[in-house]
């Protein structure tokens, strides 16, 4: 079985990270959560009270405190800036509401995309984000474009937040997700869009395992 690159793109809370992790584990591939990288950059900007115009200061912070990944004893992904574990802080609502603005900064994307491409050279990889199939891994053997209704995605995020103890209002989440969809698909640099050769998959009404099986079937055709 040959190793391949699998690119999974889609809007916020479409289930990308959840299915990407499972697929990577099942195939023994590396999983790279690109969204966590942009969240880490956003967390650093907020913590240092930087506004989006302060690009040089943010790039300097990213150099001083490199983003890296690790594993907990239970096998869960950990996210670090420098040697500080920021796995949980980057999922807070404040970071979620600002990440689109930071991710739209061309210099930040350029820096992180370069790092993502470097990691992808190491072999079989599953990467999820907004521009993996179009910008980061345009040569990926399998590209998936995952979508789901705003209502369903808000429900998923609501349940995730409640499970993590993050106070959340469902109607507010719906508005935030719709607003983020607009920002992500209308930004000038690497907007969210389906790659021409991507497999379109609407996950509305499907459970995680059903989505995983559909993607794995597509992957196995290419191995």
Swiss-Prot record:
It catalyses: CMP + ATP = CDP + ADP; dCMP + ATP = dCDP + ADP. Its main location: cytoplasm. It is found in: Cytoplasm. Its EC number is 2.7.4.25. NCBIfam families: cmk. InterPro entries: Cytidylate_kin, Cytidylate_kinase_dom, P-loop_NTPase. GO terms for cellular component: cytosol. Keywords: ATP-binding, Cytoplasm, Kinase, Nucleotide-binding, Transferase. ATP binds at residues 10-18. Belongs to the cytidylate kinase family. Type 1 subfamily. This is Cytidylate kinase. GO terms for molecular function: ATP binding; CMP kinase activity; dCMP kinase activity. It comes from the Bacteria. It is an enzyme of class 2 (transferase). GO terms for biological process: nucleobase-containing small molecule interconversion; pyrimidine nucleotide metabolic process.
């Amino acid at each position: 079985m040959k190793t391949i690159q699998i690119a999974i793109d889609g809007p916020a809370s479409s289930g990308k990270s959840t299915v990407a992790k499972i697929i990577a584990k099942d195939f023994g591939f590396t999983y790279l959560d690109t969204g966590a990288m942009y969240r880490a950059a956003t967390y650093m900007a907020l913590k240092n009270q930087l506004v989006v115009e302060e690009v040089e200061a943010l790039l300097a912070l990213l150099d001083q405190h490199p983003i890296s990944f690790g594993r907990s004893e239970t096998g869960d992904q950990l996210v670090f800036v420098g040697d500080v574990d920021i796995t949980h802080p980057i999922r807070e609502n404040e970071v979620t509401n600002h990440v689109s603005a930071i991710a739209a900064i061309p210099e930040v994307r350029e820096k992180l995309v370069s790092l993502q491409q470097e990691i992808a050279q190491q072999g079989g990889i599953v990467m999820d984000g907004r521009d993996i199939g179009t910008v980061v891994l345009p040569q990926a053997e399998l590209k998936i474009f995952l979508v789901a209704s705003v209502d369903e995605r808000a429900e998923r995020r609501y349940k995730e937040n409640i499970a993590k103890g993050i106070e959340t209002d469902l109607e507010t989440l719906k508005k935030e997700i719709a607003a983020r969809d607009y920002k992500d698909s209308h930004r000038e640099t690497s907007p969210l869009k389906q790659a021409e050769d991507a497999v379109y998959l609407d996950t509305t009404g499907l459970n995680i395992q059903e989505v995983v099986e559909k993607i794995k079937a597509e992957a196995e055709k290419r191995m």
